């Protein structure tokens, strides 16, 4: 992996997280950061399962921040990735909203 550099566009959430944490996250490395991300996903799962509405905002924020950090550590612009994949609608049927015949979960 290349040295840490800011990849999030100016004004983006990813850039904000880079400005706050990039040096520390780069020192920890992608593998260590991935472990923190997985832990936060676990906390989000727990809040959802327990229907802890008061914790959802915090846990979603944490997961979003750690995901942005992981993208940055890999030199990827998270917003550009999302727009590339979903900017034209559903990646499978290309419709907005999706018209795929997905079975109900």
Regions found by a protein language model. Name each.
Residues 1-60, 64-105:
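Flexible "arm" and connector segments at domain edges
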């Amino acid at each position: 992996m290349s040295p840490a550099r800011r990849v999030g566009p100016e004004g983006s959430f990813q850039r904000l997280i880079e400005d706050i944490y990039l040096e520390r996250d780069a020192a920890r490395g992608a593998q260590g950061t991935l472990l923190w991300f997985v832990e936060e996903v676990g906390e989000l799962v727990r809040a959802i399962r327990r229907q802890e509405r008061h914790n959802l905002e915090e846990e979603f924020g944490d997961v979003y921040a750690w995901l942005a950090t992981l993208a940055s550590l890999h030199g990827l612009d998270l917003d550009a990735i999302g727009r590339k994949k979903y900017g034209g609608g559903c990646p499978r049927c290309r419709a907005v909203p999706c018209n795929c015949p997905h079975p109900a979960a």
